[in-house]
Regions:
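Short, glycine-/Ser/Thr-/acidic-enriched flexible segments
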Residues: 67, 91, 139-141, 216-217, ...
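Glycine/Thr-rich phosphate-binding loops of Rossmann-like dinucleotide-binding domains
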Residues: 71, 94, 142-144, 219-220, ...
Length: 263
């Protein structure tokens, strides 16, 4: 399909363009990642998927929407009335182009982190119902795998452990309501994927629960990171929200930074 060719071709052509531009340099700067994995390529890919699903009358869930323009492809109708739904990742709700300067390849992911206008549009789309799900896109690469330039560094970052507190921090800033966070991270995923007896606190449902507290600020550092990769792009960030306990199927599996058992 021409749309696929345009999307993939755009990435390849831009990749080759920057290889040539920086052939006498140590590597391609990470700041060029969003130019290689461009907004145009994202839109072409999503547009094709939505068009094909619409023509076929098929059910479609689009992952990792990262640009303002892509949001035009989706509806703000109630979830139960949609045949085409959309998801945004926490990284794209937190970071923007300027953050490459400080965090470098730590925030390299696919799709790439885009401009602040894209991030702000995604946040608004969460609130208006255009974005149906918030996901982690958890990819716990080792720091050694994140080394290199815009092409060599692995894409993805560990996001599960601090995903909820990150979103609750945005709620504290007035960006989302707590109810919206619960809807996008619990209710909607269960409904969209048809996961029975989960996603809600209801009698007869599996008790998958998280107990959080709100108090003094604490800081993410290597001592409280539980992921085996041993790092987080959120190191140095502080939060007032804290996960105290996690239950899966009614069993306590996490208690104050202690991983107890598998569910």
């Amino acid at each position: 399909d021409r749309s696929v060719s345009r999307g993939l071709g755009d990435v390849y052509k831009r990749q080759e363009y920057y290889k040539e531009m920086f052939r006498n340099a140590p590597g391609i700067p990470i700041s060029k990642h969003l130019n290689i994995r461009s907004a145009a390529a994202c839109y072409s890919s999503s547009q094709l998927a939505v068009r094909m699903a619409s023509l076929a009358g098929a059910r479609l869930h689009v992952l990792h929407v990262s640009t303002a323009k892509e949001l035009q492809l989706f509806s703000d109708a109630p979830l139960e009335d949609k045949h085409i739904t959309a998801e945004a990742c926490i990284a794209h709700l937190l970071y923007r182009q300027q953050d490459y300067k400080e965090l470098g390849t730590r925030i390299k992911c696919n799709p790439s982190i885009k401009k602040q206008a894209d991030r702000d549009a995604l946040r608004n789309a969460v609130n208006t119902g255009v974005i149906d799900v918030i996901a982690t896109d958890h990819a716990p690469h080792l720091l050694s795998e994140k080394e290199g330039d815009a092409l060599k560094a692995m894409s993805g970052m560990p996001m599960i452990q601090f995903s909820l507190v990150s979103m609750l921090e945005l709620a504290e800033k007035g960006i989302f309501s707590i109810e919206t966070i619960v809807e996008k991270m619990c209710h909607a995923p269960a409904q969209i994927y048809g996961i029975c007896n989960r996603g809600y606190i209801r009698e007869g449902y599996q008790a998958d629960l998280v107990l959080v507290s709100h108090g003094e600020r604490w800081e993410v550092n290597t001592e409280n990171i539980l992921s085996k990769c041993g790092w987080s792009p959120l190191e140095g960030n502080s939060f007032r929200w804290k996960v105290e306990k996690t239950f899966a199927n009614g069993h306590l599996i996490y208690l104050s930074l202690i991983h107890i058992s598998e569910p």
